[in-house]
Amino acid sequence: VGFKAGVKDYRLTYYTPDYPTKDTDILAAFRMTPQPGVPPEEAGAAVAAESSTGTWTTVWTDGLTSLDRYKGRCYDIEPVSGEDKQYIAYLAYPLDLFEEGSVTNLFTSIVGNVFGFKALRALRLEDLRIPPAYSKTFIGPPHGIQVERDKLNKYGRPLLGCTIKPKLGLSAKNYGRAVYECLRGGLDFTKDDENVNSQPFMRWRDRFLFVAEALFKAQAETGEIKGHYLNATAGTCEEMMKRAVFARELGAPIVMHDYLTGGFTANTSLAFYCRDNGLLLHIHRAMHAVIDRQRNHGIHFRVLAKALRMSGGDHIHAGTVVGKLEGEREVTLGFVDLLRDDYIEKDRSRGIYFTQDWVSMPGVLPVASGGIHVWHMPALTEIFGDDSVLQFGGGTLGHPWGNAPGAVANRVASEACVQARNEGRDLAREGNEIIREACK
């Protein structure tokens, strides 16, 4: 009774400018570019509908549930300054729409279906506000920043790493040799490249064994705890877990996962294992630029960073600001804070659309990696501070005297910059002089 078939504008149901958002709502900020002739209110409402309870036509089963309780809402729209016919649409989703502890379900709902919508020329998810009522259902980082420092017994400075190069083609024994030389020279970590899994030239078990030998030899010689990010990423979750188990049996302190290519479900499963078994979890963001590089379409990395903090990871690559890969300083610092801090205020100048309260969820160490070397050390120390991992691949292995001297150069430069900063010197102005003094 009362059902009337037909198609009606989305905005009649899903555009609600008077809606007062709730503390438990998941809030989203979408940058949308509607097709010519499509009003922004209709476009915003269409996104809200298609990412929650709506479809293209009225259906009689709408009468069997409460749309007011379950529907997403577009509650505000603002034009983007300097952009023609581009808008920020603010959406609110009731918490009941999402499975607890599942980034997979969260993304399937909010971004799973709306990006190919005809009414839109382009759509980009700029930010999400995750309420504590939802974030508390996630595992979060297996250990977090403070526990990692306690495990490693390393405080008061950035951690230093190196990606072993060439990334593909080395035998397991030569790979282990490069690991040993870098760790002996003073680095805290070495790293499998993201596409090092288990290829014909170097099967994963052989690599793990030679790396473990290098790890323990370097530890014995330096008296410091060392780590190598053993990449457990595999074609199946079962194989991934087998590799993580073997890493634990070898006594390795940390494993690695490519969380976007491996998937959120696999990542969360690995995070649970790492927490239960005392392994740190390093996360690489391979494939992120496919999703986040276009300014008008896709998902901003700050959203992927929040998703990773919930799904689970102790480190994640976060750009460098100064190296070979793209990254704007203020925006990068915005999502670095979203990774590390407990409470982050809304700050549009840094791309943060919503205040985010992580409550007691541990933080994630941002990893600066990609085209950096010792002359970048003052800027990196100033930009990222102590709670970070600075990772020099070619910046270590490209040293003219070899791998170990390259590692020594990075360690000396880092400690010189930290000491100079602690003495009150201006790293931005005096950085080159500080590095030259350290070389003597």
From Swiss-Prot:
The UniProt record lists the EC number as 4.1.1.39
| Catalyzed reactions | 2 (2R)-3-phosphoglycerate + 2 H(+) = D-ribulose 1,5-bisphosphate + CO2 + H2O; D-ribulose 1,5-bisphosphate + O2 = 2-phosphoglycolate + (2R)-3-phosphoglycerate + 2 H(+)
- InterPro entries (UniProt xref): RuBisCO (IPR033966), RuBisCo_large_chain_AS (IPR020878), RuBisCO_lsu_C (IPR000685), RuBisCO_lsu_C_sf (IPR036376), RuBisCO_lsu_fd_N (IPR017443), RuBisCO_lsu_N_sf (IPR036422), RuBisCO_lsuI (IPR020888)
Q: Please list the residues that carry the modification N6,N6,N6-trimethyllysine.
A: 4
* Annotated transmembrane regions: none
Question: What other comment is given for this protein?
Answer: The basic functional RuBisCO is composed of a large chain homodimer in a 'head-to-tail' conformation. In form I RuBisCO this homodimer is arranged in a barrel-like tetramer with the small subunits forming a tetrameric 'cap' on each end of the 'barrel'.
- PANTHER family hit by this protein: RIBULOSE BISPHOSPHATE CARBOXYLASE (PTHR42704), RIBULOSE BISPHOSPHATE CARBOXYLASE LARGE CHAIN (PTHR42704:SF17)
Listed name of the protein: Ribulose bisphosphate carboxylase large chain
> What is the organism of origin for this protein?
Dicksonia antarctica (Australian tree fern)
By which gene is this protein encoded?
Answer: rbcL
